Amino acid sequence: MNAALDSANALNFQCETGNYHTFCPISCVAWLYQKIEDSFFLVIGTKTCGYFLQNAMGVMIFAEPRYAMAELEEGDISAKLNDYEELKRLCLQIQRDRNPSVIVWIGTCTTEIIKMDLEGLAQKLEGEIGIPIVVARANGLDYAFTQGEDTVLASMAQRCPEQVRAEEQETRGGLQALFYGLRSGKKKEEEGFHKHPPLVIFGSVPDPVVTQLTLELKKHGIRVSGWLPAKRYGELPAIEPGTYVVGVNPFLSRTATTLVRRKKAKLITAPFPIGPDGTRAWIEAIARELGIPTQGLAEREAEVWNHPQVRDYRELLRGKSVFFMGDNLLEISLARFLVRCGMTVQEIGIPYMDKRYQAAELALLERTCEEMGVPKPTIVEKPDNYNQIQRIKALQPDLVITGMAHANPLEARGITTKWSVEFTFAQIHGFGNTQALLELVTRPLRRNAALKGLGWERLVREEAPI
């Protein structure tokens, strides 16, 4: 029973390198093609990849979405076909039909196995057809679910310009509507900001979240120079040496490394703005690095926690236990948030973790456990699902946050589950989305309580005696 709970002194890290299941990273196409409005995503893989995208995203091919499959066949794998000519034909067709500003090639497991030189092909083809081609190797051999976005943003980060003309400065980063669109003059707008080096935020989140976080920083006089990715490829933010960068998601370590090493940016190590506690710590870390004082953040956080609906949800979670099997790399941030809500985290499974990139989040998790008086959880990287199921059986948690592969089998054994994929697609960042995040977490608990009231307590029907 105590195998998954560490002593109160420090977080306990383990690595099992077992068989774990996550969503395929090529699923990042689902939200990135909508985020970058003038893009076209070409997934280079097999029919299996196509079936996955078609079913996972639920988009009918008749809708002509801005993504497509380049299906590899036997001739491609046996090197009997010319890869360059085939990809050129497809890209010319995309250019003719959709005329995108950028084409993103998504590499898959098959392109890795047959060693396709996508970068070399893209560089040659880009010069021939006149459209930028970004290559991202989002294969399931090397990456977990959300790391697909990480590979795309890391490739796009290298395309960000260092210097832009003065007249372009306002349109870069996709924030001109927030800062300039409603103002008659630039001088009046500049008065509300402190003077500080450029700040770029990286991570793909829905437009309402972009607006919320940008305006939260604006309240403290912090100007956001741009977001990566921007809504349009031509609006990628300028990143010159010395630009400060900060992430909004814990799975973007490769992007952070690229920005620091290739673009000579300065990374702000901060917790991630998930939940009011994380959002407050995120803003404080940015302000501290930029040397800007903040006011009213503690009151803003308390206001969110004291909202009647948030209080009701927290009361429902208080004293309950949660177990993370690991899927989307949001586990550390969600665990910290749920500990603050009064839950006990028994184990945090996570497919991959960069301890340097998540250092501030880990420190906040540790501090939150101490303040709430609960044991610090064991963090298991690359968890072995068989071993995890044995631990779940022994610990009997009130809630298991897991990938879709294990949800129904666990439910059939009387374990309450929540799909981790829902947190990936939901709006969970910032002060304003706390209620939505808690609604997601508590939904299976409220559902089970409602079913229990109806007398429906078992998922599997017992055989009737004859």
UniProtKB/Swiss-Prot annotation:
<keyword id="KW-0560">Oxidoreductase</keyword>
<dbReference type="GO" id="GO:0036068">
    <property type="term" value="P:light-independent chlorophyll biosynthetic process"/>
</dbReference>
<keyword id="KW-0067">ATP-binding</keyword>
<feature type="binding site">
    <location>
        <position position="24"/>
    </location>
    <ligand>
        <name>[4Fe-4S] cluster</name>
    </ligand>
</feature>
<keyword id="KW-0547">Nucleotide-binding</keyword>
<comment type="similarity">
    <text>Belongs to the BchN/ChlN family.</text>
</comment>
<keyword id="KW-0411">Iron-sulfur</keyword>
<feature type="binding site">
    <location>
        <position position="109"/>
    </location>
    <ligand>
        <name>[4Fe-4S] cluster</name>
    </ligand>
</feature>
<keyword id="KW-0408">Iron</keyword>
<comment type="subunit">
    <text>Protochlorophyllide reductase is composed of three subunits; ChlL, ChlN and ChlB. Forms a heterotetramer of two ChlB and two ChlN subunits.</text>
</comment>
<comment type="pathway">
    <text>Porphyrin-containing compound metabolism; chlorophyll biosynthesis (light-independent).</text>
</comment>
<dbReference type="InterPro" id="IPR000510">
    <property type="entry name" value="Nase/OxRdtase_comp1"/>
</dbReference>
<keyword id="KW-0479">Metal-binding</keyword>
<dbReference type="GO" id="GO:0051539">
    <property type="term" value="F:4 iron, 4 sulfur cluster binding"/>
</dbReference>
<keyword id="KW-0004">4Fe-4S</keyword>
<feature type="binding site">
    <location>
        <position position="49"/>
    </location>
    <ligand>
        <name>[4Fe-4S] cluster</name>
    </ligand>
</feature>
<dbReference type="GO" id="GO:0046872">
    <property type="term" value="F:metal ion binding"/>
</dbReference>
<keyword id="KW-0602">Photosynthesis</keyword>
<protein>
    <recommendedName>
        <fullName>Light-independent protochlorophyllide reductase subunit N</fullName>
        <ecNumber>1.3.7.7</ecNumber>
    </recommendedName>
</protein>
<dbReference type="GO" id="GO:0016636">
    <property type="term" value="F:oxidoreductase activity, acting on the CH-CH group of donors, iron-sulfur protein as acceptor"/>
</dbReference>
<dbReference type="Pfam" id="PF00148">
    <property type="entry name" value="Oxidored_nitro"/>
</dbReference>
<dbReference type="InterPro" id="IPR050293">
    <property type="entry name" value="LIPOR_BchN/ChlN"/>
</dbReference>
<dbReference type="GO" id="GO:0019685">
    <property type="term" value="P:photosynthesis, dark reaction"/>
</dbReference>
<dbReference type="GO" id="GO:0016730">
    <property type="term" value="F:oxidoreductase activity, acting on iron-sulfur proteins as donors"/>
</dbReference>
<keyword id="KW-0149">Chlorophyll biosynthesis</keyword>
<dbReference type="InterPro" id="IPR005970">
    <property type="entry name" value="Protochl_reductN"/>
</dbReference>
<comment type="function">
    <text>Component of the dark-operative protochlorophyllide reductase (DPOR) that uses Mg-ATP and reduced ferredoxin to reduce ring D of protochlorophyllide (Pchlide) to form chlorophyllide a (Chlide). This reaction is light-independent. The NB-protein (ChlN-ChlB) is the catalytic component of the complex.</text>
</comment>
<dbReference type="GO" id="GO:0005524">
    <property type="term" value="F:ATP binding"/>
</dbReference>
